[in-house]
Each structure stands twice: as structure tokens, then as C-alpha cells.
């Protein structure tokens, strides 16, 4: 399949975004998939517009967005994006929507139609910590995951879409001793395993849920 992999520019005062740096390391062919890479701005709505423009020109089967989740220790494929922006910090253009619907005519939520459990298990099988996440937050990462579902629903029928959060890298936590980190190389290894696992097959039926 032809897969578009996107990653954000640095945000929140960080000088580097591990998602972007790891995506840069991905091979152009992973398994049976052809990979294209796209940097997107950490900006509400503009991020979606950049992806939409590329999708309109690219005839992609899949779009997989990668984002930073500082504080998480593992790679976390996301199950769902919700129709709300509630920004604790401004985006890279100073926008800070609070309790604003992303799309007035959109669904309350869009679930990733990728095999997220299979992908999570594949990351772990590659020796990289991973868990399935049921919340992508309410900042631009959730915004993009939701917008991907909206685009698939309204404009690109049959498009497969999803999102994976990645941890900080060591360079980002020299002044944050309480925060976990992971090397760019390990993040890229995990992303490669996840991408290899992408297919149109039914997802794995394994218990990866949370009790709270």
C-alpha cells in the first residue's frame, strides 16, 4: 500500500520533535508498503489543510500521523480522535481554542480504522515498549487524528488512517529528570514494526484495554 506518514514540527518550547526526527529515519519502503513523508505544522486546522492538499495529489491508501507525547514512556497507537479542541497551551501560531468543536458537521468521534492492536503487538514483538492508547489528548495531535477521520468520512472513502504517539528523546529530558525518554533509533524501529503490520485484515482480538 501507499502510505503517507506525517510528523509535526517542534512545539511547546521544544527545539526538536522526536516524531519528526524518527520519521526522517524511516526507509522509503517498509515491507510491502511505499512510504512518503510529510512535515506538518503544529497548528489547529492548518495541519489538516496541509495533509488534505497532499492527499488530493497523492492517491494514498493510508495516512499515519506521528506525534510527541512527552511523559509517556512507550509508543502508543491511538484508538480514537474526539471532536473537541481544548488547548492547554497555544499552538505554533498562538491559537488556543477552548471547548471548541473541530468540525460542526462531524461525528462526535472517529475511530482509527487501522489494525491498532495488531500494530501495538508488532511494536512490542520488535522489542520496543508499546501500549494501546484510548486518548490522544485535546491538543493538535487529537485534532489531526480526528481530522483524518473526518477527511476519510467526507472526502476520501476507503482511506485508512491512524496516529501513533512517541516519547521524548534523551536530549529533551536533560532538565526533566522525572520524564521518560527513548532514542530516536528505537522510536524509528517501533514505527517500522507498526507500519509493517498495517493491512486491511481484521484487527487482533487481544485484551489491550484499561480499567481506568
UniProtKB/Swiss-Prot annotation:
Superkingdom of this protein's organism: Bacteria
Catalyzed reactions per annotation: Release of an N-terminal pyroglutamyl group from a polypeptide, the second amino acid generally not being Pro
Pfam families in UniProt: Peptidase_C15
TM region(s), chain numbering: none
Record-linked InterPro entries: Peptidase_C15 (IPR000816), Peptidase_C15-like (IPR016125), Peptidase_C15-like_sf (IPR036440), PGP-I_bact-type (IPR029762), PGPEP1_Cys_AS (IPR033694), PGPEP1_Glu_AS (IPR033693)
Key word Phosphoprotein present: no
Keyword match Cytoplasm: yes
Function of the molecule: Removes 5-oxoproline from various penultimate amino acid residues except L-proline.
Family indicated by similarity: Belongs to the peptidase C15 family.
Protein name: Pyrrolidone-carboxylate peptidase
Native organism: Staphylococcus haemolyticus (strain JCSC1435)
Underlying gene: pcp
